[in-house]
Amino acid sequence: MKSISIIGAGPAGIEAASVLARQGFAVTLFEKSSSVMKNVADKAFLFPDFTAAADIVEEMNKKLLNSNITQRLDTDIVNLAREDNNVWKLTDAKGNSYYSDLVLVATGYTPFDAHRKEELGYGIYGGVVTSLEMEKMIRYDQIVNSMGERPRRVAFLQ
């Protein structure tokens, strides 16, 4: 059985793991955080139809219920190298090594640093937050400004 390592347990990584496991591959899914779908799980609702993020996370977790999938959470892959025998060597931040016939990198995205757009006031004015920060506040019902107070007014800029 061919082995494949997938780096990243977000939507793309999980979908790939599910499809490849059903095709008979031995899949190892690496995720640097302590849970899969972390970026999605921190949101309340998803665009464009406002589906609850928790529902999507639950559905994606079901796709991992396959004996051909091994999850390695809290495992930050920091190096990837091709060995002489055409096997891939993956090394994590703790120095542990893993070997695989194939590798798929599905590491997701990095949110835009709003500090780079000074004209929006992020980091300058206490009440300015990004849409991702607002999503997280809504998700965990902790809508507060930088002083820890619940805002009296909210405005959205696009």
Predicted feature locations:
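Conserved beta-strand-loop-beta-strand element in the redox core of flavoprotein oxidoreductases
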Residues: 81-97
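Short loop/edge segments at beta-strand edges and connector loops
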Residues: 73-75, 92, 130
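FAD-site-proximal beta/loop scaffold in flavoenzymes
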Residues: 112-151, 156
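A conserved beta-strand/loop element that lines the FAD pocket in flavoprotein oxidoreductases
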Residues: 64-78
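Short, well-ordered alpha-helix to beta-strand connector turns
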Residues: 24, 68, 100-101, 125, ...
